[in-house]
């Protein structure tokens, strides 16, 4: 549980006190005024649809220990004094930076944590869930809830971690250069992985190389850790089929003294998968092996050939942190599918559906089509595809790729939903 005094929060974040006392202690942070109470810090954000500052008075009435706002709404200073709350204002009215500084301070107060950073274009949440499952075979683990992986979600993940936690698995997302540098500086991961470099957010970053370099920013925040289990030196896990792996290793990891683990299907990889097959339900079967000769057969509980690389990355990190390989693999193999990510939905007497509707990318759409067409089918195969956002000038080409990929599959019906980009798929 978080435990920081209001005075410590002011010092750590550079925020200013508008009104109210400074002698309280904050034990949790929320963005929802309905959760405000004694011991809680309510942080108001002016969002696109809702302005959290409008709910500051409600948080004060609920006796939140801290209420952070932009320009304080009328009457808030008086309410803070009346209810004994500390009303604060972030430096530059930057709520994101306030959270990052606060979470960074909490991280520094807990050097015993080994933080694992998870980033990549696709597969972050599934790999994060696999990692958390495998690491729990040995450690007390705190992990990102859902996909809270941005400049707000990552700090909230750290701020909800307890000093008794041993490993924190932190998913880190980005759609602009510089974001991962800020996230990594806050979380200070010791080990990290990059699932892949795809085309997600290419409209904002310009090219896949720019995406790769933005992902590689995670290296800049990595540092050794020391816990009851011993010292851990920084290492980064990469898939060997990542065509930017050499760039990331040579220009980022090596200069920073970060060891690189390679996973894939090459004989020289540190963790390998061989003999990959899919059963009638699309579930992968393969032989997992390590460079030292250890191997074990594996059948996964989630569909798709593409998830095998996620398993390899998770196993590489679990092994590096000293988790028994058999125990970690057993827990990972028994995991259910992550919600809305190639989730197979079935009901008696109803069609089998694959829900991959969360934040798709061209590569994840292709993976969903692969899974659909790998499953045994007694009826019709139907694909319903929507448009992919944040592709910029590459949108026509990449939507055309999706359409061509779908056309080459044994589908009985293809439904395209959208406007201009959907026409490009057709």
State where each predicted segment sits.
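Residue-level signal for inorganic ion chemistry
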Residues: 9, 40, 59, 102, ...
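Alpha-helical segments flanking ligand/cofactor-binding loops in enzyme cores
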Residues: 34, 57-58, 181, 209, ...
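Active-site beta-alpha connecting loops in nucleotide-dependent enzymes
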Residues: 47-50, 54, 337-340, 357-426
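Short acidic/polar active-site loop segments enriched in Thr and Asp
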Residues: 65-66, 166, 190, 412
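Acidic, Mg2+-coordinating active-site environments of NTP-dependent enzymes
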Residues: 75-79, 193-352, 378-379, 404-407, ...
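Phosphate-binding loop of NTP-binding sites
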Residues: 95-235, 247-258
């Amino acid at each position: 549980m978080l435990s920081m005094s209001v005075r410590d929060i002011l010092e750590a974040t550079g925020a200013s006190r508008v009104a109210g006392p400074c002698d309280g202690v904050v034990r949790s942070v929320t963005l929802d005024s309905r959760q405000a109470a004694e011991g809680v810090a309510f942080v108001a954000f002016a969002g696109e649809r809702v302005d959290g500052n409008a709910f500051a008075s409600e948080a004060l009435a609920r006796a939140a220990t801290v209420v952070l706002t932009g320009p304080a709404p009328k009457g808030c200073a008086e309410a803070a004094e009346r209810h004994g709350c500390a009303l604060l204002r972030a430096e530059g009215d930057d709520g994101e930076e306030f959270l990052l500084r606060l979470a960074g301070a909490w991280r520094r107060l807990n050097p015993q944590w080994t933080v694992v950073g998870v980033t990549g274009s696709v597969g972050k949440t599934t790999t994060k869930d696999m990692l958390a499952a495998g690491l729990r075979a040995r450690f007390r683990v705190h992990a990102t809830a859902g996909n809270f992986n941005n400049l707000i979600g990552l700090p909230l993940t750290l701020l909800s971690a307890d000093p008794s936690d041993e490993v924190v698995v932190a998913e880190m997302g980005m759609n602009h250069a510089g974001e991962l540098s800020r996230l990594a500086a806050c979380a200070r991961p010791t080990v990290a992985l990059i699932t892949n470099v795809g085309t997600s957010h290419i409209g904002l970053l310009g090219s896949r190389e720019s995406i790769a370099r933005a992902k590689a920013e995670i290296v800049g925040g990595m540092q050794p850790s020391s816990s009851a289990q011993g010292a851990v030196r920084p290492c980064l896990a990469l898939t060997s089929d990542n065509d930017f792996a050499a760039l990331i290793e040579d220009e980022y990891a090596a200069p920073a003294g970060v060891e690189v683990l390679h996973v894939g299907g090459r004989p020289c990889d540190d963790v390998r998968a061989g003999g990959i097959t899919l059963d009638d339900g699309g579930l992968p079967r393969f032989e997992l092996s390590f460079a030292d000769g250890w191997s074990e057969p594996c059948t996964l509980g989630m569909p798709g050939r593409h998830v095998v690389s996620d398993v390899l990355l998770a196993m590489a990190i679990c092994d590096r942190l000293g988790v028994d390989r058999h125990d970690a693999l057993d827990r990972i193999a028994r995991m259910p599918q992550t919600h809305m990510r190639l989730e197979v939905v079935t009901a008696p007497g109803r069609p089998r559906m694959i829900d991959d509707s969360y934040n798709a990318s061209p590569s994840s759409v292709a993976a969903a089509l692969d899974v659909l067409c790998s499953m045994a089918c007694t009826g019709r195969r139907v694909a319903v595809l929507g448009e992919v956002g944040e592709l910029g000038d590459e949108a026509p080409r990449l939507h055309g790729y999706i359409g061509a990929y779908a056309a080459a599959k044994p589908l009985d019906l293809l439904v395209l939903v959208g406007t201009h980009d959907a026409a490009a798929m057709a």
